[in-house]
């Protein structure tokens, strides 16, 4: 009986691993259908009790695997740009820009996961699929991300995604007007404006 229980446990583990692998493959396959796009987005952040913390909006340009421009326009402007090698974060309000190597950037943020769509990133998560919804739970529990959900259609269109942090703060993003196709190369370059303080962490 004990051997049977162990065998059943092992079988369940194998089946679960297969399901997670299939879900990861399906998610990557769907995202791969669109190599570049532009979309507008709205953001809503709530705390652990569900109370609203912040609402915002902006524009997003992506050219996979490593080019993207995340431009938050409200409530405060901020820009996150990758030129394929360097990741720039610019805050106009404080007039500061930070430069880091993209290869050193964390892969456990929802936006980075979507923008890069790399198999090595998805392997860090247990993924469950329910129709167009994919729920990701980190295999390691030492990060700040508790759960990540993305809704992406069979045609590769991303409708929404959300992230829940360890303190249950939830950030939800609704994407609208996704336009698939070539993106102007200038969207993936960044030149710090004159007078801006630069924190270069690439050294």
UniProtKB/Swiss-Prot annotation:
Record-linked HAMAP family: LolA
Subunit structure: Monomer.
Name of the encoding gene: lolA
Any Pfam family: LolA
A GO biological process held by the record: lipoprotein transport
Keywords: Chaperone, Periplasm, Protein transport, Signal, Transport
Organism, as annotated: Salmonella typhi
Signal peptide: 1-21
SUPFAM superfamilies (UniProt xref): Prokaryotic lipoproteins and lipoprotein localization factors
Coiled-coil blocks: none
Xref: CDD domains: LolA (cd16325)
Entry similarity comment: Belongs to the LolA family.
Subcellular compartments: Periplasm
Principal cellular location given in the protein's record: periplasm
Positions of region (Disordered): 178-203
Function noted in UniProt: Participates in the translocation of lipoproteins from the inner membrane to the outer membrane. Only forms a complex with a lipoprotein if the residue after the N-terminal Cys is not an aspartate (The Asp acts as a targeting signal to indicate that the lipoprotein should stay in the inner membrane).
Domain of life of the organism encoding this protein: Bacteria
Protein name listed in UniProt: Outer-membrane lipoprotein carrier protein
Family annotation (InterPro entries): LolA/LolB/LppX, OM_lipoprot_carrier_LolA-like, OM_lipoprot_carrier_LolA_Pbac
GO CC aspect terms: outer membrane-bounded periplasmic space
């Amino acid at each position: 009986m004990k051997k049977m229980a162990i065998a059943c446990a092992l079988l369940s583990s194998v089946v679960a691993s297969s399901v997670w692998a299939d879900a990861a493959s399906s998610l990557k396959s769907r995202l791969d259908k669109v190599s570049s796009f532009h979309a507008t987005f709205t953001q809503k952040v709530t705390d652990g009790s569900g109370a609203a913390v912040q609402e915002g909006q902006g524009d997003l340009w992506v050219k996979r695997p490593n080019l993207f421009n995340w431009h938050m326009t409200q409530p405060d402007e901020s820009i996150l740009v990758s030129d394929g090698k360097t990741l720039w974060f610019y805050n106009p309000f404080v007039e500061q820009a930070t430069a880091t190597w993209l290869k050193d950037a964390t892969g456990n943020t929802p936006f980075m996961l979507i923008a890069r769509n790399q198999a090595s990133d998805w392997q860090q998560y247990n993924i469950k699929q329910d129709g167009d919804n994919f729920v990701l739970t980190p295999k390691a529990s030492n990060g700040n991300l508790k759960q990540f959900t993305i809704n992406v259609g069979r045609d590769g269109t991303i409708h929404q995604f959300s992230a829940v942090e360890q303190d249950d703060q939830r950030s939800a993003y609704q994407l609208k007007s996704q336009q698939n196709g070539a993106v102007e190369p200038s969207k993936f370059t960044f030149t710090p404006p004159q007078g801006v303080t630069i924190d270069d962490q690439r050294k």
